[in-house]
């Protein structure tokens, strides 16, 4: 039986997530499978992978062929690194303890790189939000200034309209007083 490690699609239209399965290469994509070893969700940033590492390593060691995407996932998760180190142990190049130490060092290095990337993304997001807030404050200041100028112009026009009316009113009073005398 030609065994493949591949993705099995789930989810709704335009929002797929996948199960990582072991299946016969002749079985259809979403058909019968031997074992489910994990899930892969490409919709998150970065993509979320939940993988049973031991079972994935077992199937790679017994010769299951992964699809291209699954090969990238397994490589990123360290399955191929572990296989490489176990091959070195089998050849006698180094001991199993040294292989474990190398694998842990590789894993820690990978995790630190991912955490640095995540921190950088968070920092960029905060900087963008701060810049957006500053731009909004400037726009609001301009709007407030324009509104204040408009109100001042309305007040000036209102005062100018009232001033001639007040001057005309005393003139009429004096005219009526003079006529009364």
From Swiss-Prot:
The keyword Ribosomal protein applies. Signal peptide: none annotated. One of its GO terms (molecular function) is structural constituent of ribosome. GO terms for biological process: translation. The keyword Ribonucleoprotein applies. Residues 150-181 are annotated as: Disordered. Residues 158-181 have a biased composition (Low complexity). Pfam families: Ribosomal_S16. Keywords: Ribonucleoprotein, Ribosomal protein. SUPFAM superfamilies: Ribosomal protein S16. GO terms for cellular component: cytoplasm; small ribosomal subunit. InterPro entries: Ribosomal_bS16, Ribosomal_bS16_dom_sf. Belongs to the bacterial ribosomal protein bS16 family. NCBIfam families: PRK14521.1, S16. This is Small ribosomal subunit protein bS16.
